[in-house]
Design a protein with these regions (language model features):
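Generic cytosolic/nucleocytoplasmic N-terminal low-complexity/intrinsically disordered segments
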Residues: 1-2, 20
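Sec-dependent signal peptide recognition
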Residues: 2-8
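C-terminal motif of bacterial Sec signal peptides marking the signal peptidase cleavage site
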Residues: 14-17
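Acidic/polar surface patches and capping/hinge elements
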Residues: 19-310
Length: 310
């Protein structure tokens, strides 16, 4: 999976250029930096709302696709991604005789979607208002209103797809409590946490028809025989856990997929909220784009491809 995401990321930040009529941008900040700040704001919200890694990946995907589909008109040689994915209606196109600020349109599309798929909207709306005010001071009213309207049109096409991806139906499923049968998953002490997104396999996919397209070797069968592969692998993990270096512990914590980590100290238990693995991939995308000095359209494409790949 990491190799696949790296390939997608590299594809998303390689070359292109030419232009639709683009209005003035915010003084003192590049269009690409606006997109980076938008994604970072979404990451902070995902942490605050404690979304699981699968749900976080869905949030990033829809919001980042909306952003890209709006800003790609800044460079017409960039093609639509949604028309290459499953279940999306055709995207609207801007009036070629009118001026737009496509970064503003992308921001509007991004946060229209973000508000549909997250909970804690106060901080999001506050940030969005600040960004809108900065754009309003940089472009005329007609360009501002036209760009906002275009971003909203893009978002509405994304909304039509996200309400039909089976996510809402999976919210009504009973908790997965596991099984007491040997070798089956069940909640374990000390926290007895629920199983995570056990119905995720019923979600409508973006690209693959079936997971069979990417065959994965079956894990070793459960066995309590000390000579079995299953037993040996578990012992190996246990033995290594006793000799971990501080660096190895930091790496493990960094990629830990639990956004709500329970900590235990004697009789005291407390929880820490933290970034999901998907959030790390979005952060890595930001680093790659900044290091390669990717422009705004290339940056939006990289975020969208990475998020869909998750």
């Amino acid at each position: 999976m990491k190799k696949l995401l790296i390939i997608i990321l590299i594809a998303g930040i390689t070359g292109m250029s030419c232009s639709h009529k683009q209005a003035a941008t915010i003084p003192g900040i590049s269009d690409a930096d606006v997109l980076h700040q938008n994604e970072d704001q979404l990451t902070q919200l995902i942490i605050y709302d404690v979304f699981t890694p699968p749900v976080a990946s869905r949030i990033y995907a829809y919001a980042s696709l909306a952003s890209y589909e709006a800003i790609r008109f800044q460079k017409p040689e960039y093609e639509s991604l949604t028309n290459q994915l499953k279940g999306f209606e055709p995207m609207p196109e801007p009036d070629k005789s009118k001026k737009y600020d496509f970064t503003l349109a992308a921001t509007e599309a991004f946060f229209t979607i973000a508000k549909k798929v997250t909970f804690s909207l106060d901080s999001l709306k506050e940030y969005e208002s600040t960004v809108h005010a900065r754009f309003k001071n940089a472009v005329g009213d007609s360009v501002y209103n036209r760009s906002i309207a275009f971003g909203d049109q893009i978002a509405q096409v994304i909304v039509k797809r996200l309400i039909k991806d089976n996510y809402l139906q999976t919210r009504g499923k009973p908790k997965f409590l596991g099984s007491e049968d040997p070798g089956k998953w069940r909640p374990t002490p000390p926290d007895y946490l629920d199983g995570v997104e056990y119905c995720w396999g019923t979600m409508k996919t973006f690209a693959l028809d079936s997971s069979d397209r990417i065959p994965v070797p079956a894990p070793p069968k459960y066995s309590e025989d000390k000579n079995s592969e299953f037993f040996k692998q578990n012992v190996a993990v246990y033995e290594q856990s006793k000799t971990l270096t501080d660096e190895q512990k930091d790496i493990a914590r960094y990629w830990d997929d639990n956004p709500f980590v329970m900590e235990h100290a004697g009789h005291m238990t407390f929880a820490n909220k933290k970034i999901t693995p998907g959030g790390h991939w979005i952060g890595i995308t930001a680093i790659a784009c900044k290091q390669t000095k990717a422009d705004a359209v290339k940056t939006a494409q990289a975020y969208a491809l990475t998020a869909v790949g998750m």
